Structures are given as C-alpha cells and as structure tokens.
C-alpha cells in the first residue's frame, strides 16, 4: 500500500499470554493459533494493520506454517490469493539473506519502492472494529462496557472466555487485554468495518422493533 510507518504506531502483541485452555478451545473448534501480521484496505480506502494472535481454520495454508518457517498470503483483485512459504530463521536462511545484501552492495543495487515515490500512499487508520476471543481468570479484569457486543461466553471453575467485538482504539489506548493473564486472540475473520457496524446496529434495532 506504499505506507512506511514506525512500529510503535502499529497495534501488536505476541503469543506470551496464550494459555493451554486457549489451545484446547482451538482444537475443539477445528482451529489453530498463529501470530499474524495483517494489512487490509477498508471500504473507505484506508488501511487497517496489526500484528496479533489469530485463529486460522485447519486446512488454511497458514495452519501448516510451523517452527522456523514463515508464510505470506497476498490477495489482489486480479491474481486472487497467493501463498509464499519458506524458512525465516536458522543459520542457512540468515546467511543467505546476508550474502544477498552484500552482493547487492557490491553491485550498487538498491531496492525500489515505486509505490512510495510514484503513487500517493494509502493512509493507516484505527477507526474499525475487531472480533476477538478473550480468555481470563476473573470478570473483574474485563471492562464489558467497552464491547460493542458479546455474542458468546463460557465459564469454568478456573478459566473463562468470551467472543465479542471491540473498537481497535480500545486496544491501542489500554492494556487490560494483555494483563492479569488475559489472553486475546482474533477470530478467523476479525476485521469489521465502521460501515458494517452501523449496518449491523441498524439491523438489530429493526429486529427489536425500535426502528
């Protein structure tokens, strides 16, 4: 999308808070948990970008990416989905990348960023919503009023979880979702556009007989 942004301005967290119970829930639902960096153009032309744990379906190409391997999925209007797979760590892949850079320097080769210099870059936005799975030890750590809605919740003696929709701004501005052993994982199709939220709210009111 031609965007160059500092990492501090991108919503991210790792897999450090994922619990065994989360893995068991994933297995029951036929899902895997992967750390995914995602960039998607919204209906308003702006771009949503983040790096967060996410559920993927068994059989999804990303579900087969394990250990030192990385996978990249690219989707375009003309080429549909393309999947790239290969080693992203280890001595040989690292040595190959370093050798490639040394060779590029020797021949004065420079990487091109045509979209940055010859096109108007798209704009990042945090004005959208995400559908999340959230597991936790106690309800007192969870600000339920911050959710647009909660569509599922489950409670055991030791661990609880819910599935609901949150504004991304809530995750950016607050840290409760990665404290007190709280685990947040995006659902399979997590991004909900502002326009979709407005439509869903209107439809809910119509079904309730308010409009």
What are these regions (language model features)?
Residues 48-134, 209:
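Catalytic, metal-anchored helix/loop core of enzyme active sites in primary metabolism
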Residues 16-19, 38, 54, 82, ...:
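Residue-identity detector for glutamine
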Residues 100-211:
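A conserved regulatory-domain signal marking ACT and ACT-like small-molecule sensing domains
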Residues 1-64, 69-71, 90:
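Substrate-binding/catalytic subdomain of NAD(P)-dependent oxidoreductase enzymes
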Residues 27-29, 34, 40-46, 57, ...:
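Context-gated lysine
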């Amino acid at each position: 999308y031609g965007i160059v942004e500092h990492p501090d301005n991108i919503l991210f967290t790792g897999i450090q808070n994922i619990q065994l119970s989360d893995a068991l829930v994933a297995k029951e639902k036929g899902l895997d948990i992967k750390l995914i960096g995602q960039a998607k153009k919204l209906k308003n032309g702006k771009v949503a970008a983040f790096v967060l744990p996410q559920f993927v379906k068994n059989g999804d190409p990303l579900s087969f990416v394990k250990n030192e391997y990385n996978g990249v999925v690219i989707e375009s209007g003309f080429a549909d989905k393309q999947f790239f797979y290969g080693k992203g760590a280890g001595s040989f892949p690292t040595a190959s990348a370093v050798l490639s850079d040394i060779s590029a320097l020797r021949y004065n080769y420079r990487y091109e960023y045509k979209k940055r210099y010859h096109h108007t870059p798209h704009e990042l936005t945090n004005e959208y919503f995400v559908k999340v799975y959230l597991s936790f030890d106690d309800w007192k750590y969870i600000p339920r009023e911050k959710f647009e809605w909660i569509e599922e919740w489950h409670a055991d003696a030791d661990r609880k979880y819910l599935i609901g929709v949150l504004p991304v701004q809530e995750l950016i501005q607050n840290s409760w979702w990665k404290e007190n052993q709280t685990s947040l994982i995006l659902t399979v199709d997590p991004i909900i556009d502002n326009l979709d939220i407005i439509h869903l709210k209107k439809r809910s009111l119509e079904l309730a007989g308010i409009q």
